């Protein structure tokens, strides 16, 4: 277990699809002694379609697919970001939203995961994570506006798989 508070910088998609912005945000987090920089790894073609509209439009993107496509990184770009973070001795963590994003982050060596309230009920993704994570992985749960009992039930499932 952790013996001191862990500070996480929630970058999510604030990089706006720019590797340079992502690296600048990692540098800023390092400057303020953040322990983990947490991104979202969306992969548009597995998580959306051109027909999926925004609840509230953001910027010039017409659909959620357009937004995620514009802000997603390739495995090569993520690899560059990982190497950049490693040079600064800062850890990365990820929220993932599809099996494909999960396996991409596994290939890159990710060991820190956040399951947000929107994914707590994604039983398929939860099962894939339970089958593939190990004692060296850390899972952060954000129950948010979800039913607390449901969130606790999911957390207990992971307690047999991961150490932290």
Model-predicted regions and their roles:
Residues 7-11, 37-39, 92-94, 111-115, ...:
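Hydrophobic faces of well-ordered beta-strands that scaffold small-molecule active sites
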Residues 35-72, 117:
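Glycine-rich, proline-tolerant flexible connector loops at the mouths of alpha/beta enzymes
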Residues 18-19, 49-50, 74-78, 101-102, ...:
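Active-site-adjacent beta->alpha loops and helix N-cap segments on the catalytic face
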Residues 10, 29, 105:
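Conserved, mostly hydrophobic/aromatic
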Residues 12-14, 40-44, 97-99, 118, ...:
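Active-site beta-loop-alpha junctions enriched in small/polar residues
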Residues 1-14, 50, 79-80:
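N-terminal small/glycine-rich loop or linker at the start of catalytic domains
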Residues 24-42, 108-109:
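Catalytic domains of carbohydrate-active enzymes, especially glycoside hydrolases
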Residues 33, 105-113, 130-139, 158-164:
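Glycine-enriched alpha-helix->loop->beta-strand junction motifs that scaffold or abut catalytic
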């Amino acid at each position: 277990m952790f013996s001191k508070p862990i500070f996480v910088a929630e970058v999510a998609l604030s990089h706006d699809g720019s590797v340079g912005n992502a690296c600048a945000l990692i540098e800023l987090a390092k400057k303020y002694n953040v322990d983990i920089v947490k991104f979202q790894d969306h992969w548009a073609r597995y998580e959306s379609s051109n027909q999926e509209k925004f609840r509230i439009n953001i910027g010039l993107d017409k659909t959620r697919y357009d937004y995620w496509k514009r802000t997603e990184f390739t495995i090569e770009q993520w690899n560059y970001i990982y190497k950049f973070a490693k040079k600064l001795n800062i850890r990365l963590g990820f929220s993932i939203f599809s099996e494909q994003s999960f396996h991409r982050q596994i290939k890159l060596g990710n060991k820190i995961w956040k399951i947000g309230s929107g994914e707590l009920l994604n039983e398929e993704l939860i099962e894939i994570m339970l089958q593939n994570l190990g004692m060296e992985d850390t899972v952060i749960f954000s129950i948010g506006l979800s039913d607390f009992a449901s969130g606790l039930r999911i957390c207990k499932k992971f307690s047999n798989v991961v150490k932290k």
